[in-house]
Amino acid sequence: MQTGSGVYHAEELPAGTEMFQIWFEPHLARAVKEAPTYHQYDHEQFPVEEADGVRIKHVIGPQAPIRLVTDAEMADIEIAAGQSWTYSLPDGYALAAVVVSGRGTAWPQRQADGGAADNAPLETGDFTVVTTNGTESVVFQAEPGESLRLVAIRVPAEVEYPLYRK
């Protein structure tokens, strides 16, 4: 849903559906001039990659059917027990992740000096944000014997337009 100058709302959720809402702040002066839009997507419409015990469903971004007026990418990631997923975070961006289910760890791998920070434990319901001072990779590792599912969102750490007043 992109609200623009108003809102269209029409969810119909079948039994067993899980969802959460995320609001991205566009350039408000431009966004209010746009007509509101609403689209319903089915699971099969999202491209999925699978390799080395990691399944990535692209939700928002260049590989996904959902494109926004804001600079954002979003993926639903499932990491098999004991496996890891590494994401290269460009300079000037932040990666936010919410753990949907499971347990594991996350840590940044700094590419500039080759060092690594301590592992941060993660479990269902946890939310973490990683920002960079240069290109860096973030590693998410599932616990042995338990898979880890998270939703990861990449956005600019700062934008060059005014945000909503808090």
PLM region descriptions:
Residues 1-166:
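Jelly-roll (double-stranded beta-helix
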